[in-house]
Amino acid sequence: MKKSTMNKARSLTAIYSRHPINILLATLALFMTPSWDEAQAQTANPLNFSGDFRVRHERTTRQEPGARPDIRDPRNRDVVRFRFGINRKVNGLFNFGARLATGSPDDPNTTDITLGDFVNDLTISLDRAYLELAYKNLFLTGGKFANPFRTTELLWDGDVNLQGFGASYTFSGSKKIIPKLTGVYYIIDEQTTNPDSYMLGGQLQFSINVSSNLNLTLAGAYYDYTIKSLANAKSDDIQGNFLTPDGKAYLSDFDFIDAIATIDYRGFGERYPLRLVADFAKNRGALDEDEAYSGDLYIGKVAKKKDWRIQYGYALAENDGVLAAFSHDNTTLASNYEQHTLGIDYVVVENTILNLTFYRYRRHHLKSANSIDNEFFSRLRLNALVNF
């Protein structure tokens, strides 16, 4: 490291060492403010910024009937989410990126944070930090990075960022059918004295250009989890999945076959594209309660002012048909659920979206010993989102 950069780093560390989040900001500042002798070389590779802010009001009925204590009253809460990322090309091959986000550092499924707690300050952490290499059709990444697989929220919540190493290769040569192969080594839990937990996953995807108005995408994946310990898992990580009698390990292994089909049709005009997404997953590591599936229909888009989009979705997941630690957290049930989703998006002005999402859901199976009716829960969300 050059002397000027070292001096700058010492100064920033001295100023910001009083609080962990300030250290994160100082690290970003180190990349944002190059020394004079470096500035000219970096002009061709500027630092790129992106981010978004969302505010939400949420109402949930019948929170947890049958729990101890029995909670049947509705809950109203207000939630915010803030994300701010940077990325920069280091040279012709490598790209560095990082992102700050609100939310609990102990919960990989969400960047939301509930307002309240006697007006305490919001928690912000580094939810992405990665290095990428792109060479022709080959893509490599390492660190904590966005999920490179084609997914739905059945198995993967949209806020989950993988940590470890990933690679993909896009095969060229055909304009009609474009295959893509993706692989990931996903580090879940590293321990000094106990066995590590990790996932090895691969996906083969085919993008098929059927006609000028119709595209079809098919993706098949296999995710092989090895989870030896739940010592560092939180209660939200294991909700709904079967555990051993002592509660210290999963009862099942998690080895998923996941198949996704997406149809994009543009025959109704530019403003009203239609998308249909179907997902089916089977856990080969479970003896029973091992399947999950979902279907979503979208009409419209949210690209510019006065655009709108509507969505209807249906999903069903058995207890070990998903891994609750990384599947969706849109409702109070992460597995063993049946769910209907209705969503409406409207672009008020450029980069500003209003959204209404309604969930109606219940447990797929309910133990008779609980002596409770398996009635539907409801959750209504009103969102305002700004991108910048």
Predicted regions and their residues:
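Cleavable N-terminal export/targeting peptides
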Residues: 1-44
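Beta-barrel outer-membrane channel/assembly domains of diderm bacteria
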Residues: 38-140, 168-179, 208-214, 262, ...
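Extracytoplasmic loops and strand-loop junctions of Gram-negative outer membrane beta-barrel proteins
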Residues: 64-70, 111-114, 149-150, 188, ...
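Short, conserved acidic/polar surface loops in the N-terminal third of protein domains
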Residues: 108-112, 143, 151-156
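Signature for the C-terminal beta-barrel architecture of outer-membrane proteins
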Residues: 134-139, 148-310, 314-316, 358, ...
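Short conserved micro-motifs at the rims of enzyme active sites and ligand-binding pockets
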Residues: 231, 322-325, 367
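C-terminal hydrophobic structural anchor segments
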Residues: 306-359
